[in-house]
Amino acid sequence: MKTLSTSNFAARFLTAVALVALLAWPMDAEAQFFKKKENRYTDPYKGFTEEAYMDMDFLPNISTPEVHKKAKSGVKKTIRALAEQLKNKVTVDLVRDDEVVLVTFPTDDLFLPNDTMLTTEGTALLAPLLPHMKNPMMYKIVLAVHTDDTGSELYRDELSTARLNSVYDWFMLAVESGQIQENLIIIPFAMSSTMPLADNNTRDNRALNRRLEVYFIPGPQLIDEAYKGQLK
């Protein structure tokens, strides 16, 4: 039987160890690369355009821009403060792990039954939101109008679209009057009856499902100042 000399055995052993290390290196390097990429701070102003968000569906819009983990604490503190300021005037919830303020209005308070024009009382209910929208880089705004399941699918689609247009137009009038700036990003969604809060099996539940949602989503200035520790 052929045997290896001590020197040949050591050489082959070292070669095998080197090969294992070489094969393992790309995996370690790849893991380190993705770890660094995950921790990398991306300029939140990049890609923050109305055109980009208009092309997104509803849920991706609620999820973006993302907040870097270093900025999360500051963003959440600001979002909670906003919710505190609004809670005595409107119905407020915190979503996306306390990174987003959700304001909900029953559409019965904004519109007459089966009507699509905002009432005077409805515009008065929306007005307290405007002072918090003055800085267009602090928040992205998403509007979502929901219906119950009454009537045909076509009717529900048309109703939610018409009501959404009425709300959106009201915000555009606020732009024209100088109450908010033209470059504030407002993304509208007519949701029809696709996302009910409750089964449409009672009158109260149907009323609960008929709603306007207004989302305050962290904008690039809020994220950037939170990341840099510059929030007041």
Indicate where each model-derived feature is located.
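Short, aliphatic-rich beta-strand segments
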Residues: 101-106
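Bacterial N-terminal signal peptides
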Residues: 14-24
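A short, flexible beta-alpha/helix-coil linker loop
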Residues: 108-112, 148-151
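Periplasmic OmpA-like peptidoglycan-binding domain that tethers envelope proteins to the cell wall
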Residues: 147-230
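Extracytoplasmic/periplasmic, Sec-exported soluble proteins
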Residues: 67-74, 114-121, 125, 135, ...
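Periplasmic peptidoglycan-binding/anchoring modules of Gram-negative envelope and division proteins
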Residues: 75-96, 111-145, 214, 221-226, ...
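Bacterial N-terminal signal peptides that target proteins for export
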Residues: 2-15
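N-terminal targeting leaders that direct proteins to extracytoplasmic destinations
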Residues: 29-100, 116-117, 124, 222
